Amino acid sequence: MKIKTRFAPSPTGYLHVGGARTALYSWLFARHHGGEFVLRIEDTDLERSTPEAIEAIMDGMNWLNLEWDEGPYFQTKRFDRYNAVIDEMLEAGTAYKCYCSKERLEQLREEQMAKGEKPRYDGRCRHSYEHHADDEPCVVRFANPQDGSVIFDDQIRGPIEFSNQELDDLIIRRTDGSPTYNFCVVVDDWDMEITHVIRGEDHINNTPRQINILKALNAPVPMYAHVSMINGDDGKKLSKRHGAVSVMQYRDDGYLPEALLNYLVRLGWSSGDQEIFTREEMIKLFSLGAVSKSASAFNTDKLLWLNHHYINTLAPEYVATHLQWHIEQENIDTRNGPQLAELVKLLGERCKTLKEMAQSCRYFYEDFSEFDADAAKKHLRPVARQPLEVVRDKLSAITDWSAENVHHAIQATADELEVGMGKVGMPLRVAVTGAGQSPALDVTVHAIGKTRSIERINKALGFIAERESQQ
């Protein structure tokens, strides 16, 4: 049997992390078994579905590099197919027209609730032989079996059983002629030959209804696997108040797709004690049997740790391709300064996100107008004038500009003045970066460049001179 899975989001908003994890599990299962992965856009909610949401979903999938083999399919382009199947069901007697008014249905609901019963349609039109005009408004309902039960072997949770007496005669076509979500899903899974439906646990109650429709159509029934929800670290359902929940928001916040994928795959699935997984390892090791039945707690600190790991272990040239977007958001002109791959090497240890990296690298490319006030007050004092003058002259004398020779110049200055490295290094750091913190000083000065470093030292000396004149 050829394995075929699908990811079927509704385009009513962005791609959130719960949906992304479902997509990842479906994608991994298909890839593990050498099968196919289908992208389907379930846009039957015409009022809430938007082109912007569709674009956001596609952007999220592409950024995560979860490539699909078929699609994207759009349900709104398949209405003729759905309605043709409904018409066949009406002919076969597995569906029927319902003319009950909203008022009657509301009254029925109130009466059932008053008796402590579960609200459900009472089947009045199912057994009615009353004549109606062809143009009289009606819905079409599925004639759900009235006895027995539906049992399916959930690939994560084990056997689940529903009594047919608990299930309603589901509306499959509205009065305006449009098919409903639960019906469209069934026909799509049938037509697209989906073998495994991997989705959120909020769909468990839909499953027996969909299985009954498939059986009425003499269609094969796929295997089902329902993934538990993701909670915030406070145990409540993950929401905006827990921070970013949109996949692309994590991109905007400076996370690498590898970090988010690695984090999401472990959010409910495990393989021993292993924490770090390459994409290839995920594909090789993934199984639905190792997915937890329990809800998972989203831990941003863990994601941040993974992101820092990947910034420092992936090829700098690759990380730089993602950093470029953040550099552009900061409007930094990188033509006069180190290559971005070099910047990744310089700042990788200090920065946990690419956004942080982009926001802390401007001094490598552009001159600053002011020194950080606290750093200048502490380190650009009259006592720093001589160390800065000496180190400037030694840097000027370097003919082979390298980090190693920069280091020798700083060390030689400290030796000549018989002071500790900090007495030279800290004023120099503030002079060339404008702040009190940076990567190792030798590689920083080297990356900034000889001419620019000397110009900035002279600027710092001018700052010190002005400070002396005011005392």
Curated annotation (Swiss-Prot):
Catalytic activity: tRNA(Glu) + L-glutamate + ATP = L-glutamyl-tRNA(Glu) + AMP + diphosphate
Enzyme Commission number, as recorded: 6.1.1.17
A GO BP annotation: glutamyl-tRNA aminoacylation
InterPro entries according to UniProt: aa-tRNA-synth_I_cd-bd, aa-tRNA-synth_I_codon-bd_sub2, aa-tRNA-synth_I_CS, aa_tRNA-synth_I_cd-bd_sf, Glu-tRNA-ligase_bac/mito, Glu/Gln-tRNA-synth, Glu/Gln-tRNA-synth_Ib_cat-dom, GluQ/Sye
A Pfam family that the UniProt record links to this protein: Anticodon_2
Sequence positions that bind Zn(2+): C98, C100, C125, H127
Location(s), subcellular: Cytoplasm
Source organism, top-level taxon: Bacteria
Cofactor(s) this protein cannot do without: Zn(2+)
UniProt remark on cofactor binding: Binds 1 zinc ion per subunit.
Cellular component terms (Gene Ontology): cytosol
Residues the entry annotates as binding ATP: K240
Alphabetically ordered keywords of this record: Aminoacyl-tRNA synthetase, ATP-binding, Cytoplasm, Ligase, Metal-binding, Nucleotide-binding, Protein biosynthesis, Zinc
Gene Ontology molecular functions: ATP binding; glutamate-tRNA ligase activity; tRNA binding; zinc ion binding
Location of the motif 'KMSKS' region: 237-241
Positions of short motif 'HIGH' region: 9-19
Main EC class the enzyme belongs to: ligase
Record note on quaternary structure: Monomer.
Function, in words: Catalyzes the attachment of glutamate to tRNA(Glu) in a two-step reaction: glutamate is first activated by ATP to form Glu-AMP and then transferred to the acceptor end of tRNA(Glu).
Family of the protein in this entry: Belongs to the class-I aminoacyl-tRNA synthetase family. Glutamate--tRNA ligase type 1 subfamily.
Protein name in the entry: Glutamate--tRNA ligase
Name of the gene: gltX
